[in-house]
């Protein structure tokens, strides 16, 4: 059990997770060393609305001036992270919640001044993750990072990909509410970069699946070898640890 697996769970999925999801995490833990990264978009947007702070997005990234970053930090590192940790522990999964600024876990480079406190992962302090795992804890990471002693928001997909690449993880698992990529009503079990481009061009991949596959492609570019898009509301893990869904690699596809 030397291989790492990184599981990314978007904020919109956190309230949909059922017993099946936690059973799948237990199965993964029997085969791999597990790290979880979570988002929190819906809860952040709701809190910003409560605070009467307008939200602007550019190219899918939330524009994050200081007052927005304060709310992002409060939600991601506070309520969202701790609720997820408590839910894992309710299902007998020992977990430790932390953010990318704890122990300088996630160091970032700012994306641009125009979008404020938004960063991309430049360095991962893997020793912290490995230490927690060696003590039989699952690290549960809120995707914020640091740069020059300032806190930055990180897209959860790219945070998970950065962590997976730094750990040389066997796989990055993207938890969604769909079974994977469907083609003519059938699940595409394996695909690659070129086939995904064809699927998008032909309209096979549309709507909410497009950002999911774009996240998978971005992860490949960051050095992750394999990404699986799975349905977190169903049993997505074989007893062997293999995922049930769509697996994206750089190699030749087998549909």
Curated annotation (Swiss-Prot):
Reactions that this protein is recorded to catalyse: N-acetyl-L-glutamate + ATP = N-acetyl-L-glutamyl 5-phosphate + ADP
Taxonomic placement: Bacteria, Bacillati, Bacillota, Bacilli, Bacillales
Described function: Catalyzes the ATP-dependent phosphorylation of N-acetyl-L-glutamate.
Cited InterPro entries: AceGlu_kinase-like_sf (IPR036393), AcgluKinase_fam (IPR004662), ArgB (IPR037528), Asp/Glu/Uridylate_kinase (IPR001048)
Subcellular location(s) per record: Cytoplasm
Short name of one Pfam family: AA_kinase
Site residues (Transition state stabilizer), renumbered to this chain: 8, 212
UniProt protein name: Acetylglutamate kinase
């Amino acid at each position: 059990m030397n291989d790492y697996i990184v599981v990314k769970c978007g904020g919109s999925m956190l309230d949909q997770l059922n017993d099946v999801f936690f059973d799948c995490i237990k199965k993964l833990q029997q085969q791999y060393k597990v790290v979880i990264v979570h988002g929190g978009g819906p809860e952040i947007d709701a809190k910003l609305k409560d605070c009467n702070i307008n939200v602007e997005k550019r190219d899918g990234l939330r524009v994050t001036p200081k007052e927005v970053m304060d709310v992002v930090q409060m939600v991601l590192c506070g309520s969202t992270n701790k609720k997820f940790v408590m839910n894992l522990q309710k299902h007998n999964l020992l977990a430790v919640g932390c953010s990318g600024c704890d122990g300088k876990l996630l160091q970032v480079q700012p994306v641009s001044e125009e979008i404020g406190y938004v960063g991309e992962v430049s360095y991962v302090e893997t020793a912290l993750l490995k230490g927690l795992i060696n003590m039989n804890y699952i690290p549960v990471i809120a995707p914020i990072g640091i740069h020059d002693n300032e806190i930055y928001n990180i897209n959860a997909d790219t945070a998970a990909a950065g962590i997976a690449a730094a750990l040389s993880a066997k796989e990055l698992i993207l938890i969604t509410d769909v079974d994977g990529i469907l083609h003519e009503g059938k699940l595409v079990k394996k695909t690659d970069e070129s086939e995904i481009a064809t699927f998008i061009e032909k309209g096979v991949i549309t709507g909410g699946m497009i950002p999911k596959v774009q996240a998978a492609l971005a992860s490949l570019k960051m050095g992750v070898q394999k990404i699986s898009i799975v349905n977190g509301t169903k049993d997505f893990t074989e007893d062997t640890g293999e995922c049930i869904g769509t697996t994206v690699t750089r190699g030749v596809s087998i549909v």
